[in-house]
């Protein structure tokens, strides 16, 4: 059954920013459950390539990171590359991360992102730009996008394509599996948050609810029982591009391929970013997006893939 577009979030505040020579607006948004998150909007710049006609892209990061993963203060990054190619980019930072408020009155987990925040942003973008939406995520960010579509909280029919970097739940991840999964739970109780910065895992600490959901998702995805995590993935028929790093030990490429194969799309591509497949290096979990070599060969691959599908939709 098709779902209706979610209502846009309430915009609590907004302000203008620049990233190098790119201008942007950052909004603090509030979902219907009261949770707040940051949304950075990079509109089509006047000098951009017009062939993709401002096709919208919604990007979100994985654990412990924010918009800096996609665009630097100097205007460098995959998000900036997409803007220069003529795409209209929105970057969502989950509750409690990046520019989002640290103090939340509502739960700040991954579940809330797929239930409330991602659908609300889809509704906001659709009001402003009627073109089909591309969604993009790294690590857990890609999993969240796919899960929100599979559960029909985001509207599937309005999606031009899904791009996932190192996104998977089923291979390794010992820290999120019993018995080791007790450690993040204990650390959250001790600090009141997961101390990612102290552990040098990323620039932002995670809310306890997000770690709780991460543990539950991994357990559910690996379960051989009757759990519903994968329900709805066979209904995902939009184009999908899944990229796995040849030396990614955080989210190994076999798991990335497994997630991509859960989609029923006829337009489904898995790329192994490795020397064996013609790339300049074997990419790791971060380097597949944030590295000079990725800028040379991965960003153009992704932008070209999206550009072809934007033209097909227009």
Task: State where each predicted segment sits.
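Short beta-strand/loop motif that positions the catalytic acidic residue
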Residues: 236, 242-244
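Short alpha-helix in the alpha/beta-hydrolase fold that links the catalytic acid
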Residues: 238, 252-262
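Acidic beta-to-alpha connecting loop that harbors the catalytic carboxylate
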Residues: 246-248, 286
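N-terminal cap/lid segment of alpha/beta-hydrolase-fold proteins
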Residues: 8-50
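Alpha/beta-hydrolase-fold enzymes
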Residues: 127, 131, 136, 140-225
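Alpha/beta-hydrolase active-site loop
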Residues: 107-127
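Short, surface-exposed "cap/lid" segments of acyl-processing enzymes
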Residues: 44-99
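Catalytic active-site module of serine/aspartate enzymes centered on a nucleophile-bearing elbow/loop
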Residues: 273-314
């Amino acid at each position: 059954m098709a779902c209706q577009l979610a209502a846009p979030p309430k915009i609590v505040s907004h302000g203008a920013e620049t990233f190098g020579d790119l201008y942007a607006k950052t909004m603090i948004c509030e979902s219907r459950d009261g949770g707040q998150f940051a949304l950075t909007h990079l509109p089509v710049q006047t000098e951009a390539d017009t062939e993709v006609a401002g096709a919208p892209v919604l990007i979100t990061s994985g654990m412990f990171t924010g918009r800096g993963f996609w665009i630097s203060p100097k205007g460098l990054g995959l998000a900036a590359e997409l803007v220069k190619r003529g795409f209209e980019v929105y970057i969502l930072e989950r509750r409690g991360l990046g520019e989002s408020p640290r103090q939340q009155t509502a739960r700040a987990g991954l579940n809330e992102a797929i239930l409330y925040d991602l659908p609300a942003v889809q509704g906001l973008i659709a009001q402003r730009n009627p073109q089909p939406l591309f969604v993009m995520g790294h690590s857990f960010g890609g999993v969240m996008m796919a899960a929100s579509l599979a559960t029909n909280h985001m509207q599937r029919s309005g999606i031009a394509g899904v791009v996932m970097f190192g996104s998977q739940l089923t291979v390794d991840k010992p820290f999120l599996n019993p018995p080791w999964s007790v450690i993040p739970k204990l650390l959250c109780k001790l600090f009141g948050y997961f101390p990612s910065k102290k552990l040098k895992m990323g620039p932002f600490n995670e809310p306890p609810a997000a770690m709780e959901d991460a543990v539950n998702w991994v357990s559910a995805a690996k379960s051989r029982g009757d759990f519903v995590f994968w329900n709805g993935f066979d209904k995902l028929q939009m184009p999908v591009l899944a990229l796995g790093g040849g030396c990614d030990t955080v989210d190994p490429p076999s798991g990335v391929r497994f997630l991509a194969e859960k989609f029923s799309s006829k337009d489904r591509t898995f790329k192994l970013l490795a020397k064996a497949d013609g790339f300049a290096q074997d990419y790791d979990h971060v380097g597949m997006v944030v590295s000079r070599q990725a800028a040379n060969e991965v960003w153009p691959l992704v932008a070209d893939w999206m550009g072809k599908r934007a033209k097909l939709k227009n």
